[in-house]
UniProtKB/Swiss-Prot annotation:
GO molecular function: carbohydrate binding
Lineage of source species: Eukaryota, Viridiplantae, Streptophyta, Embryophyta, Tracheophyta
Official protein name in the record: Salt stress-induced protein
Pfam family, one: Jacalin
Gene behind the chain: SALT
Source organism, top-level taxon: Eukaryota
PANTHER family reported for this sequence: OS05G0143600 PROTEIN
Organism: Oryza sativa subsp. indica (Rice)
InterPro entries, sorted: Jacalin-like_lectin_dom (IPR001229), Jacalin-like_lectin_dom_plant (IPR033734), Jacalin-like_lectin_dom_sf (IPR036404)
Length: 145
């Protein structure tokens, strides 16, 4: 099974965040946001068949956006913005996630430079990596094409 790492979008602040076991299927995502993306956590099934709970990366509280994917549902598109917020030069300010069941989830406030990752045909997001401190500085995705 091929795995592709795409990104990062955002700034260079914070610490690098990544997973150690390659992902096979994304189960769910929880995002906390306000004027920016404050934290992200997710669950996935690894290529070893085990379930992993990752994060939260970032910190702080805010509005919770919970995405629980059905057994045959997957994320087919992620877009968002990144730019200056508070006294930080470049962080992820907004995320929009669309699933194969045409469910759309939004978190944060659109502000800054736009990015979009529409996936072709059967491609789907199976995990995340990025940079975080007290907020999400940058985000990238793992994709099964």
């Amino acid at each position: 099974m091929t795995l592709v790492k795409i990104g990062l979008w955002g700034g260079n602040g914070g610490s690098a965040q990544d997973i150690s076991v390659p992902p096979k299927k994304l189960l769910g995502v929880t995002i906390y946001s306000s004027d920016a993306i404050r934290s992200i956590a997710f669950n996935y099934i690894g290529v070893d068949g085990q379930e992993y709970a990752i994060g939260p990366w970032g910190g702080g509280e805010g509005t919770s956006t919970e995405i629980k994917l059905g057994s045959s549902e997957h994320i087919k598109e992620i877009s968002g913005t990144h730019g200056p917020v508070y006294d930080l030069a470049d962080i992820v300010t907004y995320l929009k996630i669309v699933t194969s069941a045409n469910n759309t989830y939004e978190a944060g406030v659109p502000n800054g430079k736009e990015f979009s990752i529409p996936l072709q045909d059967s491609g789907h997001v199976v995990g995340f990596f990025g940079r975080s401190g007290t907020l999400i500085d940058a985000i990238g995705i793992y994709v099964h094409p």
